[in-house]
Amino acid sequence: MISPLPLRQIGQETILIFINMKHLFHSLLAVAFVLCAGFQQAVAQQMQFPPLPVDKNVRIGQLDNGLTYYIRHNKLPENRAEFYIAQKVGSILEEPQQRGLAHFLEHMAFNGTKNFPGDDKGLGVIPWCETVGIKFGTNLNAYTSIDETVYNISNAPIDRTGVLDSCLLILHDWSNYILLKDDEIDKERGVIREEWRSRNSGILRVYTDLLPTIYPGDKYADCMPIGSIDVINNFPYKDIRDYYHKWYRPDLQGIVIVGDIDVDAVEAKLKAVFADVQKPINPAERTYYPVADNKEPIVAIGTDKEVDDPSIEIYFKQDATPDSEKNNVGYLASQYMTSMISSMLDARLNELVQSANPPFTRASSDYSDFFVAKTKEAFSLSASSKADGIETALKTLLQETERARRFGFTESEYARARANYLQSLESAYNEREKTKHGSYVREYVQNFLNGEPIPGIEAEYAMMNQLAPNIPLQAMNMVMQQLVPDSNQVVIIAGPAKKGLKYPTKEEVISLLKGMKDLDLQAYVDKVSDEPLMKEAPKGGKIISEKEGDIYGSTKLVLSNGVTVYVKKTDFKADEIRMKGTSLGGKSIFPDKDALNFAVMDNVIAVGGLGNFSQVDLTKVLAGKKVSVNAGLGATTENVFGTCSPKDFETMMQLTYLTFTAPRKDTEAFESFKNRMKAQLESAQANPLSSINDSLQKAMYNNHPRVVMMKPEMVDQIDYDRILEMYNDRFKDASDFTFYFVGNIDLETAKPLIAEYLGALPAINRKETFKDTKMSIRKGVYKNEYAKEQQTPTATIVFLYSGKAPYTLKNDILLSFATQVLDMVYTEEVREKEGGTYGVNCFGDLQKYPKEQLLLQIVFQTDPAKKDKLAGIVVDELKKLAAKGPSDVHLQKVKEYMLKKYADNQKENGYWMNNLNDYFYYGMDMTEGYTDIVNSITAKDIQKFVSDLLKQGNEIEVTMTVPNK
């Protein structure tokens, strides 16, 4: 797998301010320190900032051979562990004849190692992992980027004998014992070609072509990990082995292990396992290639027929913070400050996005690595625009950047940004005993690769709660001035190659950059309302009955207006309560003629805001709170979803009340929505894949009027008033709504708020259910193959099988077995043996409403010249499964994964929310007897299940290919 861009960090020296920090490091350190003037490295090196502690819960060490390791015991998930090996190497280190081999090598790590050869001497890495429920792609994966390569084994069931030892052995082999057999290399060439085919999008081609302009004379001018297809097809075996032996070595590798483990025991095992990995003699220097400064602006403009929408990126380059200078309070403060600036500027840009005629369809700012280079940082702004709005978008980005640089931000903007930051920090602190292994792994990998600090949440929470309130707005505004220098400017514009589409010239862009300081601008005015979310509480209802010990250990409440509530308290997360409210009806209630309106209803309603607050104002009034509520219209249900911190439960109840009773009409926001939607739909037409979904929907539903394929010309037909009328109809009667709450909810605290707000929801006691809209999937065999011009010749093939099947827990489990078995079969037969695709994806859906039916979908992409052969293999393997069932090996692998996943789900709030909903919506307990059914499944069960589906004779095949030349 290729990481599209490296992981990015924020940070740099900040500006001259004095801060009194009391009780830092839990009252052990009181310090007044200076954050240096500007981003001047020479000044920064003179500053003596207090060092940050290293999280005491992680053990960090280094073996004699140079290998670094991080080991931590963590409780959750129980009996699980994460095993990572991070390498400080990537595509930047390739020689010209090796372009693409860093990524190729990553693939080869899964195709034979010393202890997992994948031949008659022993199982390979993937087959062995799957025997213990570690699924390839889900729990077993890797990525190659420009400066790093990272492999992972995740969610390993270490309570099973030998799993921990074997995972260590895999890391050991990845470090120094990948076999790189000739025949395996040749087989993998095809897989890499198909990965290139699937990823070689218009925007990637543009960026690749522009790199020499963005990085003139620098090593980063040719560094994309996919490399050269000519190299992939023809490189001699020696070239990849040379790269491997030169760069995969212990002094550039870090092992990270976090899980429900004994740290002492794992450390001892690691030392023993890696003892035979030799320290390199006279190793090649690992160079971090610099990026040159530029006095005059660099402007890179590129186009491609398959780029969706025009995009603009503006970079103001800064010197990167050396890894050795990150582990101090000054760096932590600088991260905070640049984060606040981006947050405040993003809020301004979002306001413009919501305007009636927005200058861009999206816009944001950031402080991170400069494009793809980790040796230079940059303050950046980016936006997407309408096809005819490139210059307007660019001008507006520059205008807002200059406005912020010249006038700074306001106290109210800073207060909101800081409140949101501290809320997020508090949430992480509250979850410190519930944090999962993966969160720590990501921190330690970044510490190894990039020197990012790892003080631990307790120390960070204490420090930042002292530091953040003491960094004044004046400091932020001074930093903003430093972030936008007159030199080191880079502008990248990418867009569709379309007749009549006008792009600014390089000279015009430079003129705009140089004219920033002469713009006639006024300071931003922050319009803030002091009005509360609700001026007065509604006249609440009452809880008329309460029953403890209901389904799944929930408590059932019935309110005086008919609303039914189920509350399940859990301790899985400390700072989360989830909510769902649902009622039967949904889109099915409305006639076919309203299809366009109900297709966009959710988005249209959301843009208006609630009560007296626009969407922009609502964001402001909710600053510092962890809460969200949104409504949605499904095919057969209307729903309201919410999540909050326990302390913000009343706010979630207020938002829910307003969602039912006070959707807000905002004509300007609606016009903005329409303009942005038109632009996005027009842009999407450039993407060849946009047509495959339309073709599939037409094939499935035989052009049913309720299937809406949105086109730009349809946007003006959307009826805002009708949408509001339809929405109000669905939410004017709460008497048949059932609400579910799952999470860290205190029932006695919640009950009066539930009664006050949910009990006050309108009720007219309608008795209704959903309607059958006769939207049936096409019967019989249907095939549609069509050709479409593509820059990278690709065939995309979709198979869809449908039929009747009872909605039962066993059938749901059988469908999961079937899709997982097919995934493994197709990986072996189509990806590995044929080298014909990057992956075949299988999806299944078992439906009860409006009628019971089963769907099985299979999708893959390949070389058009191979499509018929591979499609034949896909169909043949499906028929084999229907005739003979799966192999015992595949059957057992799926069982292992499903039982592991089931055990993990028991401590997930989302899992129990879904079960509560399913119990009442489907009238079925989807947990009772689950493990017994999984264990009882036989190959014959799966064979019959798939055979019963195929016998019904309903097959749709849609293929998009390229015209014959």
What are these regions (language model features)?
Residues 184-252, 256-258, 263-271, 278-288, ...:
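Hydrophobic, small-residue-rich alpha-helical packing segments that form membrane-like cores
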Residues 101-109, 341, 601:
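Active-site His/Glu-centered metal-binding helix of metallohydrolases
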Residues 723:
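OB-fold/S1-family RNA-binding modules
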